Amino acid sequence: MATITDPRDIILAPVISEKSYGLIEDNVYTFVVHPDSNKTQIKIAIEKIFDVKVDSVNTANRQGKRKRTRTGFGKRKSTKRAIVKLAAGSKPIDLFGAPA
């Protein structure tokens, strides 16, 4: 397993879906993360990037779907998601970054 030092290499992208958008009200955020990262690395990276206090981290490995192509079958890549719950007094994360 390779060591990942930069927090922006661990957190790849936020997951924007109906379910994850509904969880934002409960201070729960979902991110696509590097497949080799662990919960401790994810927690430290979120705290450094967004300057918040993380309460808990859950991870889920998602297998890539098998898809048909013109010449046969291909496979989408597998991903890892992190469901991050922020501490009670923590400020919310601005995922969209729109200037006011």
From Swiss-Prot:
The keyword Ribosomal protein applies. Keywords: Ribonucleoprotein, Ribosomal protein, RNA-binding, rRNA-binding. GO terms for cellular component: ribonucleoprotein complex; ribosome. One of its GO terms (biological process) is translation. It comes from the Bacteria. GO terms for molecular function: rRNA binding; structural constituent of ribosome. The keyword Acyltransferase does not apply. InterPro entries: Nucleotide-bd_a/b_plait_sf, Ribosomal_uL23-like, Ribosomal_uL23/eL15/eS24_sf, Ribosomal_uL23_CS. NCBIfam families: PRK05738.2-4, PRK05738.2-5. HAMAP family: Ribosomal_uL23_B. Part of the 50S ribosomal subunit. Contacts protein L29, and trigger factor when it is bound to the ribosome. Belongs to the universal ribosomal protein uL23 family. One of the early assembly proteins it binds 23S rRNA. One of the proteins that surrounds the polypeptide exit tunnel on the outside of the ribosome. Forms the main docking site for trigger factor binding to the ribosome. This is Large ribosomal subunit protein uL23. It comes from Mycolicibacterium smegmatis (strain ATCC 700084 / mc(2)155).
